[in-house]
Amino acid sequence: MWISADDFRLKAENFDLSNGFNILRIICGLFLFPHVMGKFAAGTVSAATVGFFAKAGFHPPEVWIYIAAISETAAGVALVLGICTRFAALGAVALLAIAVYSLQVVKGFGWTWNTGGYEYPVFWAITSLAVAIEAWKAHLRLTRPSLEPKHLKVAASS
């Protein structure tokens, strides 16, 4: 089954900070929130953000800004809480890939983040992809029966 009610449950184990995967998942979610806040100035859509979205080819830009903000918020909250992690992480990868594409369209090639390049979104896209892969592996371990033939299992000695 691709998704179940269990995917939406808050679990204490999702907040065990001795597990490095949880730390990475939570940080991936938290780092999406500044992107949401950066789209708005004084409670409204930032003029600079409207200009960027328009130059990137997203028309009408205001609508796409709200779609992006809602998507980033949803992915961020889900990653922080550990709900639907495998889908939220893939959503974050898609959002960040679109950000890289947009930067390429608007500014051309630029790698380093301090010059407006896409080093930062590429890094977080790869990190989110790693989170998605680990979440899918965990899901498959729980939902798939063991593929190891029974005759190869070592019998417990008495």
Residue locations for each model-derived region?
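Extended, low-polarity transmembrane helix blocks
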Residues: 1-41, 62-70, 74, 81-158
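Membrane-interface interhelical connector segments
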Residues: 41-60
